[in-house]
């Protein structure tokens, strides 16, 4: 019985004897690490060995650029916050006949506070579609990125989410395939009284890290709202603003991102605030119905049309760097509604409200013209008949009545 107990005790001490003097550590110890693009992170792998010097090295990444520094008993992997750092490197350590390994999944992400909402304010009592776009993001995965339209701290009930859209951003440097993702909602009636504002909230969920950005969409109130422009006026209604942007990071690594100043107070006619360089929209009345968007913000700036009443594809567009033209196809009367132009890089937008013009109905014009022509012909026939009756051949009639013609 004593021999059996001694054998069991010896077997229980085997793991302790094997691991004695062999400490394998990785810092940070997580198996998944999220790194913001442009930031750096060092992952240290070390091992102690009583039988000499432990051999430790990283494998699975390109080490030709000096991203790995190997020392006796340790190896340091430097992550530079580039998309090429994404992957799963493995640290391997050996001491005598014993070997250990630890894999780390590295995810490089980009989620700047660059939310753009359209329209920039909401008008109660109108059918509206609101869009929210997150720019320069990575990864552009619906499983990682989610959108929400909030009233207060709750999701807006009755808002119909449309299909999200994803496009690749135009980058100055190659090798950084960032994307923009847009979510649109068809809004229900905002009710009376209308809420002061809605919020677009975008959340990126990563391993042990949750990032959130939020942007305000003000709702115009009757006492401070700009009145809709008179449809008979030719003066357009211009809106430029820098809306509130709010960013909060939650999770195991808690970080608070900077937020922008509060939304400027609405004025009875325009809404504007000092901010970055923005595009400007001009209406060319001499060239017929045509809008010109241009930006004087230095070289490398491009502008494009992003919103128009109806379908933007039905308009004629010409884009040339910092200038973009928009006109109706086929040429016709002014279209009433909001037009939006966007500037890249930067994502700044400018909106222009164009009032409709009252044009005569073409069918009514044709009917009036035909009616006038018929009346003229009838008058001519009557005059010809009277002249023929007065001066026809035969017995000379009494022409006293003809003098009244």
UniProtKB/Swiss-Prot annotation:
Span list, region Disordered: 255-275
Where does the record say carbohydrate is attached? 230, 253, 361
A Gene Ontology term for the protein's cellular component: membrane
- Provide the membrane-side ranges marked Cytoplasmic in the record: 386-405
| PTM notes | O-glycosylated; contains syalic acid. The Ser/Thr-rich mucin-like domain may provide possible sites for O-glycosylation.
Q: What up-regulates or down-regulates this gene?
A: By TNF-alpha, and chronic inflammation.
Cross-referenced Pfam families: Adhes-Ig_like
Keywords (alphabetical) are: Cell adhesion, Disulfide bond, Glycoprotein, Immunoglobulin domain, Membrane, Repeat, Signal, Transmembrane, Transmembrane helix
Disease annotation reads: Absence of Madcam1 in the spleen has been found in aly/aly mice, but normal expression is found in intestinal venules. This aberrant expression is a secondary defect and not the direct cause of aly alymphoplasia, an autosomal recessive mutation which induces total aplasia of lymph nodes and Peyer patches.
The record's subunit annotation is: Homodimer.
Q: What is this protein called?
A: Mucosal addressin cell adhesion molecule 1
Name of the gene = Madcam1
């Amino acid at each position: 019985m004593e021999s059996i107990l001694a054998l069991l005790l010896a077997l229980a001490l085997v793991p302790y004897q094997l691991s004695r003097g062999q400490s394998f550590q990785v810092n940070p110890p997580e198996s998944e690490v999220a790194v913001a693009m442009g930031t750096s992170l060092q992952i240290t792998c070390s091992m102690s060995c009583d039988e000499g010097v432990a051999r430790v090295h990283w494998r699975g990444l390109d080490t030709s650029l000096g991203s790995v520094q190997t020392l006796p008993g340790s190896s340091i992997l430097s992550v530079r916050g580039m998309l090429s750092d994404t992957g799963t490197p493995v640290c391997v350590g050996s001491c005598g006949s014993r070997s250990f390994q630890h894999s780390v999944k590295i995810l490089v992400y980009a989620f700047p506070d660059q939310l753009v909402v359209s329209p920039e304010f909401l008008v109660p009592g109108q059918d509206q579609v609101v869009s929210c776009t997150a720019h320069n993001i990575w990864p552009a995965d619906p499983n990682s990125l989610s959108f929400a339209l909030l009233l207060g701290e709750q999701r807006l009930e009755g808002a119909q989410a449309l299909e999200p859209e994803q496009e690749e951003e135009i980058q100055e440097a190659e090798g950084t395939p960032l994307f923009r993702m847009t979510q649109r909602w068809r809004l229900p009636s905002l009710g009376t009284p209308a809420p002061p504002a809605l919020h677009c909230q975008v959340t990126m969920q990563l391993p042990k890290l949750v990032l959130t950005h939020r942007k305000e969409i003000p709702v115009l109130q009757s006492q401070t709202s700009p009145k809709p422009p008179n449809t008979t006026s030719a003066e357009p209604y211009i809106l430029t603003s820098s809306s509130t942007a709010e960013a909060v990071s939650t999770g195991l690594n808690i970080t608070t991102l900077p937020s922008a100043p509060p939304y400027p107070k609405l004025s009875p006619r325009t809404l504007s605030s000092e901010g970055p360089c923005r595009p400007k929209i001009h209406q060319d009345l001499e060239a017929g119905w045509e809008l010109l968007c241009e930006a004087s913000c230095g070289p490398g700036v491009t502008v494009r049309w992003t919103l128009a009443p109806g379908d933007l594809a039905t308009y004629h567009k010409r884009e040339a760097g910092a200038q973009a033209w928009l006109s109706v196809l086929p040429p016709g009367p002014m279209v009433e509604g909001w037009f939006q132009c966007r500037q890249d890089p930067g994502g700044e937008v400018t909106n222009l409200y164009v009032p409709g013009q009252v044009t005569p109905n073409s069918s009514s014009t044709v009917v009036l013209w035909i009616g006038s022509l018929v009346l003229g012909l009838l008058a001519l026939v009557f005059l010809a008949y009277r002249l023929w009756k007065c001066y026809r051949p035969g017995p000379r009639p009494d022409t006293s009545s003809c003098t009244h013609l």
